[in-house]
Every structure is written in structure tokens, then in C-alpha cells.
Curated annotation (Swiss-Prot):
Pfam families: GIY-YIG (PF01541). This is UPF0213 protein YPO3475/y0709/YP_0608. It comes from the Bacteria. It comes from Yersinia pestis. Residues 4-79 form the GIY-YIG domain.
């Protein structure tokens, strides 16, 4: 089991769609997506732009956070892009 620090990221496609994902290396994952070796949802979508990323803790926390962000409306995701909060865990996972 690895203690790697995970990150949550949002990519914007050429058509304006926002894609949410998690990784231990944002630059590597973005390069994979841009090379067509990432998620099928992004293949053939044109240029991809990293518009948001933040630390998400361990893998378990990152997966929970990814799920919560994927449940947000496009408008709420756009607010994340504008506000650029450093930590989302306090917004979404603290009860």
C-alpha cells in the first residue's frame, strides 16, 4: 500500500466540457490524456486544458472527493475553477 499524495484535477475540453479525475502525478496524467491514452471520455475531444487541481490526501479520500465533485452541476464546477480553493476536503468531506 502506498502513502502517495493524491490530487484531484479538472480538465476543460475544446468544447467546454469539464472532466474530473484523480492522480498521484497531475503533469503525467495530463500528458497521458493529451496523448489519447487516458480516459475514453476525453479521446477525440480536442485540446485539453488543466483548469483546476488540488491535493486530495490518500487514495481513499481522493476517490470520495472525486465522487462528490462529479455530482456537482457544471455551474458549481465552474465556481471551483474560478475560486481555486486549495483544499476541497474541508468543503465536501468534513461533516
Amino acid at each position: 500500500m502506498s502513502d502517495s499524495l493524491w490530487h484531484l484535477y479538472l480538465l476543460r475540453t475544446a468544447s467546454g466540457m469539464l472532466y474530473t479525475g484523480i492522480t498521484t502525478d497531475v503533469a503525467r496524467r495530463l500528458a497521458q490524456h493529451q496523448a489519447g491514452k487516458g480516459a475514453k471520455a476525453l479521446r477525440g475531444k480536442g485540446e485539453l486544458t488543466l483548469v483546476f487541481h488540488c491535493e486530495a490526501g490518500d487514495r481513499s479520500t481522493a476517490l470520495k472527493l472525486e465522487y462528490r465533485v462529479k455530482q456537482l452541476s457544471k455551474q458549481q464546477k465552474e465556481k471551483l475553477v474560478i475560486d481555486q480553493p486549495r483544499l476541497l476536503t474541508t468543503l465536501f468531506l468534513d461533516s
